[in-house]
């Protein structure tokens, strides 16, 4: 999610305040080490989730009689004030307090006294941060799922409007067969539908509560983890304390789903870039998604799709970073895991921003239908239809394939497309394949038209305009 945390003073104090853990040590941490090990620079964006988790924990402690009712009231009052300070940009984030957790706890203690010191009873920063990350990531996934839906709705509108707009379908970037632009766009709907399913499935594993696992072995206090899970909207608790505080597979899974989504959008971006080039001339993008050149006044560059391609590498890199981070860690928690947040945050930010832009950009595509159709006059796009025609007339497919290949070669020599041959010319081109020429009749010319080719693919998943419209309607039903 885009970081909206107010800026704050993150400098270290000239004094050496006592750390939450300093009693064990005989000398203070050096300023260099403080800066190297602190995470408050980036984990303060989880402040809202940290407060939510702490309030649920405090309610449980009071409910179990571990802290008093007045302690709970003081904690709730202090947290409300802290939340307001953060939202107004008035909270003083301090490097000396290392991370979001201790910064908030120290401020709470300053506001409410001993009640603030009692808040950490029965928990560790290990299970606290694992809970914060899951809360934050759950929010991010919900936002991403909504944005995928926005993108898909706009994509369906463009696909419906172009359900019968013919264009070349490509394999190996060579003209293959006629399809419609709407059918082509619906391929990306299906890709992002699977992406949404992956995020929704990942959310199930994110939505498990680590809190109560403490440092690694659980706690001796009579806590009620199920109560906290209900308070925070988790489906269940994590059932092994070692696993709960130490693994980040849920974050890796999220980054993997993000990499797949970005890969799909990168492929789409590559096509938009190609289609916008004068060599294709299939579409134009709205000016607000393009930039010019500082030296070439005629240029209109598709910078947004190009950056989507580039940022896909960035998201893939974050996935590799997290996999590498986890691969060598013994159980349980290690400081290595502090490095999980920046790749995770950056991945979510990139995906969210990309989806927001794409949902708008898709509505600004101007389709150049004449150019799309004109491209079908090159590359013998209906050659397969001619082969299928011969097969339906009784010729074995391999013989039909050979006969049509000979016809294409003859068309290349003549410099024309297959529909420009007369019936006799087509028969002559296929004469070397026994039985092929005899199968041809005047009805072949209806088969060789673009419309004939498109209409013949009239089955579920096919490119016939009627099927594209049906696919759009079905997709809208699934979206709700």
From Swiss-Prot:
Alphabetical keyword list: Amino-acid biosynthesis, Arginine biosynthesis, Cytoplasm, Lyase
Family annotation (HAMAP family): Arg_succ_lyase
Domain of life (superkingdom): Bacteria
Name by which UniProt lists this protein: Argininosuccinate lyase
A GO term from the CC aspect: cytosol
InterPro entries: Arg_succ_lyase_C, Argininosuccinate_lyase, Fumarase/histidase_N, Fumarate_lyase_CS, Fumarate_lyase_fam, Fumarate_lyase_N, L-Aspartase-like
Record's catalysed reaction(s): 2-(N(omega)-L-arginino)succinate = fumarate + L-arginine
Pathway(s) served: Amino-acid biosynthesis; L-arginine biosynthesis; L-arginine from L-ornithine and carbamoyl phosphate: step 3/3
GO BP annotations, alphabetical order: arginine biosynthetic process via ornithine; L-arginine biosynthetic process
Predominant cellular place of this UniProt entry's protein: cytoplasm
EC number: 4.3.2.1
Feature: compositional bias, Polar residues: 1-17
Region (Disordered): 1-24
A Pfam family per the record: ASL_C2
Localization in the cell: Cytoplasm
Top-level class of the enzyme under EC nomenclature: lyase
Record-stated family: Belongs to the lyase 1 family. Argininosuccinate lyase subfamily.
Example of a GO MF term: argininosuccinate lyase activity
ATP-binding recorded as keyword: no
């Amino acid at each position: 999610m885009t970081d909206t945390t107010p800026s704050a003073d993150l400098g270290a104090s000239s004094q050496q305040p006592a750390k939450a853990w300093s009693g064990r040590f005989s000398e203070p941490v050096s300023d260099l080490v403080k800066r190297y090990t602190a995470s408050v620079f980036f984990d303060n964006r989880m402040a809202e989730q940290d407060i939510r988790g702490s309030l649920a924990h405090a309610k449980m402690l009071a409910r179990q009689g571990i802290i008093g009712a007045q302690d709970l009231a003081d904690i709730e009052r202090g947290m409300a004030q802290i939340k307001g300070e953060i939202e107004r940009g008035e909270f003083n984030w301090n490097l000396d307090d290392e991370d979001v957790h201790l910064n908030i706890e120290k401020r709470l203690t300053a506001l409410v006294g001993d009640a603030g010191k009692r808040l950490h009873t029965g928990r560790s920063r290990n299970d606290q941060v694992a809970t914060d990350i899951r809360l934050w990531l759950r929010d991010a996934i919900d936002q991403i799922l909504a944005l995928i839906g926005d993108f898909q709705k706009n994509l369906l509108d463009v696909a419906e409007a172009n359900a019968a707009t013919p264009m070349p379908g490509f394999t190996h970037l060579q003209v293959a067969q006629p399809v419609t632009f709407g059918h082509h766009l619906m391929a990306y709907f299906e890709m992002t539908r699977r992406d949404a399913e992956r995020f929704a499935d990942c959310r199930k594993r994110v939505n498990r509560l680590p809190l109560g696992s403490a440092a690694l072995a659980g706690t001796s206090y009579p806590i009620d983890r199920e109560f906290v899970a209900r308070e925070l909207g988790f489906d269940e608790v994590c059932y092994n304390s070692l696993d709960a505080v130490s693994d980040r597979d849920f974050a890796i899974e999220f980054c993997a789903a993000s990499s797949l989504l970005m890969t799909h959008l990168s492929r789409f971006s590559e096509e938009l870039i190609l289609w916008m080039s004068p060599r294709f001339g299939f579409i134009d993008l709205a000016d607000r998604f393009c930039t010019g050149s500082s030296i070439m006044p005629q240029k209109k560059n598709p910078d947004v799709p190009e950056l989507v391609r580039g940022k896909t590498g960035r998201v893939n890199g974050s996935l590799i970073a997290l996999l590498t981070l986890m691969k060598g860690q013994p159980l349980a928690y290690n400081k290595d895991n502090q490095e999980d947040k920046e790749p995770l945050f950056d991945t979510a930010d990139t995906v969210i921003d990309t989806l927001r832009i794409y949902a708008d950009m898709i509505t600004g595509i101007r389709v150049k239908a004449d150019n799309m159709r004109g491209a079908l006059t090159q590359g013998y796009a209906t050659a397969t239809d001619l082969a299928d025609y011969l097969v339906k007339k009784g010729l074995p497919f391999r013989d039909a394939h050979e006969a049509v290949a000979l016809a294409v070669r003859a068309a290349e020599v003549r410099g024309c497309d297959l529909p420009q041959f007369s019936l006799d010319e087509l028969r002559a081109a296929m004469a070397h394949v026994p039985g092929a020429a005899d199968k041809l009749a005047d009805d072949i010319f209806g088969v060789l038209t673009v419309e004939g080719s498109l209409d013949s693919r009239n089955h579920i998943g096919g490119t016939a305009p009627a099927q594209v419209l049906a696919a759009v309607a079905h997709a809208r039903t699934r979206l709700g």
